[in-house]
């Protein structure tokens, strides 16, 4: 069984940024990244075809909005991505369409300050670039969904549904809340919340407070529609990068 100093569950922007930050800070211990998807991305994932290596479409957030003034640590993570062309400013405009199909004022009426940035060639390239800043001490376990968590005084034990795959970790980071939020009960038809089962109520008052707060957060199902228009010659001006439906 593999044993790590640190295991990060979730290869979205949060998990990948953490790993890149630890690299810059000189973290030396063996680290593992565990992700249910076939690659990094999380909420900024890009869906790749299983049969056509050239086919890929963004089906998560199409861009991220960055304020004009970023903390130096964040800027230090993003600068290599900008320099490599992996993170690029969005130049196309946004439009809003009403129920009658008419273009109306841009939504929201008072946008937050900052600029939109997107990944190239696809949005998941941002997370891939962040992981590229990590050393070869990082081991990635993709297409692996953690189902069971167990906690002892010495380590965490992680297992998949069948328990054929297992890891041990001195430290554990959940970069998403699926293993800590009741939404997993309905979404994955589990009968328990893994983190709550691993640390029974009363064992850790601080964790109890966190899980109570997290439990109060709402979760609703969302569906994404992915369209492949093929090789279409669009006329100028360029298509809007985002269309808001009101």
Question: How does the language model describe each region?
Answer:
Residues 48-73:
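N-terminal glycine-rich dinucleotide-binding loop that anchors FAD/FMN and/or NAD(P) in oxidoreductases
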Residues 53, 166-244:
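Central helical "cap/lid" subdomain
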Residues 63-71, 103-132, 141:
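Short beta-strand to alpha-helix junction loop
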Residues 14, 39, 179:
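Conserved Rossmann-like nucleotide-cofactor binding loop
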Residues 2-4, 162-171:
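Core beta-strand elements of the Rossmann-like FAD/NAD(P) dinucleotide-binding domain
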Residues 7, 21-51:
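Glycine-rich FAD pyrophosphate-binding loop
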Residues 1-14, 32:
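Beta1/beta-strand and adjacent pyrophosphate-binding region of the FAD-binding site
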Residues 141-157:
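A conserved short coil-to-beta-strand element within the FAD-binding core of flavoproteins
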């Amino acid at each position: 069984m593999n044993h790590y100093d640190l295991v990060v569950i979730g290869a979205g922007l949060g998990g990948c940024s953490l790993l890149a930050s630890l690299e810059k800070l000189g973290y030396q211990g063996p680290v593992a990244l565990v992700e249910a998807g076939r690659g990094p991305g999380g909420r900024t994932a890009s869906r790749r075809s299983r049969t056509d290596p050239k086919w890929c479409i963004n089906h998560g957030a199409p861009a991220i909005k960055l304020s004009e003034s970023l903390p130096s640590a964040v800027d230090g993570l993003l600068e290599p991505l900008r320099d490599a062309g992996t993170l690029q400013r969005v130049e196309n405009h946004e439009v809003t369409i009403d129920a009658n199909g008419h273009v109306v004022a841009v939504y929201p009426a008072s946008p937050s300050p900052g600029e939109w940035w997107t990944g190239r060639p696809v949005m998941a390239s941002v997370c891939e670039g962040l992981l590229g800043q990590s050393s070869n001490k990082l081991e990635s376990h993709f297409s692996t969904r953690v189902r069971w968590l167990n906690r002892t005084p010495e380590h965490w034990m992680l297992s998949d549904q069948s328990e054929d795959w297992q890891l041990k970790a001195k430290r554990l980071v959940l970069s998403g809340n699926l293993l800590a939020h009741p939404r997993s009960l309905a979404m994955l038809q589990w009968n328990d919340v893994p983190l709550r089962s691993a640390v029974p109520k009363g064992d850790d008052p601080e964790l109890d407070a966190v899980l109570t707060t997290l439990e109060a957060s709402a979760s609703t199902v969302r569906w994404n529609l992915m369209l492949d228009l093929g090789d279409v010659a669009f006329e100028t001006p360029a298509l809007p990068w985002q269309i808001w439906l009101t």
